[in-house]
């Protein structure tokens, strides 16, 4: 009995250490970046910090619960969960139900929690896609319909996300799906055809709507529109420049003083770069590399143990988190167009934090089942 109890409480140390380190750093940076705007909006400097702390506590509880749920349960209910996510995407578009913030209708109010539907959809899509790839592996590898079926579903999801609009979530879900299909053994030529179609669409966009294309590519020279479409990015770049090697010190950021919009959410990495400098940036990115690398290793072990659903699930979560990290940092550094994506485990955002922690709980369960 004692041996069984010890095993049931064992967790992957690297996943736990990296996740807790990221969450602690995120809590610290949210406190620093949000004090001024919180005081201005609510007359209390710790409003966003307290809310983030509550979400973090809920997230850790959710991760613990998820680590206790057998993977076969996720597999059994993946289709139903995907359907729930799909219905939520439709409901959020209804003016009576969906909550609009900054021109985007992405949230559903559930008591004191504003649920960002796209964050839920990312998770449930990976759950369902992993199940599809495991059940129809032969079809995926040998027949065109094995590629078209999941891409059709993802295309519908992306269309609904673009109606919100939430371009960033659509990009993450689509790229995660494509990468998982590639890992599952889809032949190369469907990807080539898709690439040609995307290139053709961009050319058509440039011809029919040059203004939209200009907005999409304004990140290439934000200084040309520094008081317009490039304002947020130029302020972010100034934060990077001020940070230098060692930063200006925790809490000493100037850009968070109403210069940089969304300083505690989408552009929190810029505040971190300003306050902690290049050293802080490298530390943060190192933690992400360790975490995502460990998740991939766990997926590989599951694949070697012939637990294909667990393997695809782990790969999907690694791709989701990795893509979101790359896009968020790329946006704040000015090498990618603005997408409106949070930095996993770091940025303020309850839905994102809860789903990230839930995903980590699932990974811990996969690691446990693979080892035992």
Swiss-Prot record:
The record's listing under InterPro entries reads: Cell_cycle_FtsW-rel_CS, FtsW, FtsW/RodA
Q: For this UniProt record, give its keywords in alphabetical order, as a comma-separated list.
A: Cell cycle, Cell division, Cell inner membrane, Cell membrane, Cell shape, Cell wall biogenesis/degradation, Glycosyltransferase, Membrane, Peptidoglycan synthesis, Transferase, Transmembrane, Transmembrane helix
Instruction: List the pathway annotation.
Output: Cell wall biogenesis; peptidoglycan biosynthesis
GO cellular component terms, semicolon-separated: cell division site; plasma membrane
Superkingdom is Bacteria
Localization recorded for this chain is: Cell inner membrane
What Enzyme Commission number(s) appear in the record?
2.4.99.28
Q: Can the keyword Phosphoprotein be found in this entry's annotation?
A: no
Catalytic activity reads: [GlcNAc-(1->4)-Mur2Ac(oyl-L-Ala-gamma-D-Glu-L-Lys-D-Ala-D-Ala)](n)-di-trans,octa-cis-undecaprenyl diphosphate + beta-D-GlcNAc-(1->4)-Mur2Ac(oyl-L-Ala-gamma-D-Glu-L-Lys-D-Ala-D-Ala)-di-trans,octa-cis-undecaprenyl diphosphate = [GlcNAc-(1->4)-Mur2Ac(oyl-L-Ala-gamma-D-Glu-L-Lys-D-Ala-D-Ala)](n+1)-di-trans,octa-cis-undecaprenyl diphosphate + di-trans,octa-cis-undecaprenyl diphosphate + H(+)
Report whether Cell membrane shows up as a keyword of the record.
yes
One BP term from GO: peptidoglycan biosynthetic process
* Entry GO MF terms: lipid-linked peptidoglycan transporter activity; peptidoglycan glycosyltransferase activity
PANTHER family hit by this protein:
CELL CYCLE PROTEIN (PTHR30474), PEPTIDOGLYCAN GLYCOSYLTRANSFERASE FTSW-RELATED (PTHR30474:SF2)
What name has this protein been given in UniProt? Answer: Probable peptidoglycan glycosyltransferase FtsW
Per the UniProt record, the lineage of the source organism begins with: Bacteria, Pseudomonadati, Pseudomonadota, Gammaproteobacteria, Legionellales
């Amino acid at each position: 009995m004692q041996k069984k109890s010890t095993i049931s409480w064992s967790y992957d140390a690297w996943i736990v250490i990296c996740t807790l380190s990221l969450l602690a750093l995120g809590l610290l940076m949210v406190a620093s970046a949000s004090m001024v705007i919180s005081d201005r909006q609510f007359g209390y400097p710790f409003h966003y910090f307290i809310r983030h702390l509550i979400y973090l506590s809920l997230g850790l509880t959710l991760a613990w619960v998820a680590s206790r749920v057998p993977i076969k349960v996720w597999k059994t209910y993946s289709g139903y969960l995907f359907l729930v996510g799909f219905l939520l995407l439709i409901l959020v578009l209804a003016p009576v139900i969906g909550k609009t913030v900054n021109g985007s209708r992405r949230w559903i109010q559930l008591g004191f929690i504003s649920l960002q539907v796209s964050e839920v959809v990312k998770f449930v899509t990976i759950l369902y896609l992993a199940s599809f790839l495991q059940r129809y592996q032969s079809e995926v590898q040998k027949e065109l319909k094995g590629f078209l079926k999941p891409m059709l579903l993802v295309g519908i999801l992306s269309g609904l996300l673009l109606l919100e609009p939430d371009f960033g979530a659509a990009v993450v879900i689509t790229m995660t799906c494509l990468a998982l299909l590639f890992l599952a053994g889809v032949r190369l030529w469907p990807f080539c055809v898709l690439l040609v179609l995307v290139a053709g669409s961009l050319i058509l966009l440039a011809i029919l709507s040059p203004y939209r294309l200009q907005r999409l590519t304004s990140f290439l020279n934000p200084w040309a529109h520094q008081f317009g479409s490039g304002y947020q990015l130029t302020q972010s770049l100034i934060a990077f420049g001020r940070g230098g090697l060692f930063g200006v010190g925790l809490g000493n950021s100037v850009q968070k003083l109403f210069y940089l919009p969304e300083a505690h959410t989408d552009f929190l990495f810029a505040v971190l770069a300003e306050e902690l400098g290049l050293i802080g940036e490298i530390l943060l990115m190192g933690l992400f590399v360790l975490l995502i690398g460990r998740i991939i290793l766990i997926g590989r072990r599951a694949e070697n143990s012939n637990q294909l659903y667990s393997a695809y699930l782990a790969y999907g979560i690694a791709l989701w988190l990795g893509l979101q990290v790359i896009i968020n940092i790329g946006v704040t550094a000015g090498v990618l167009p603005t997408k409106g994506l949070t930095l996993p485990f770091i940025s303020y955002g309850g839905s994102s934090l809860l789903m990230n922690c839930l995903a980590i709980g699932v990974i811990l369960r996969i690691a446990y089942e693979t080892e035992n």
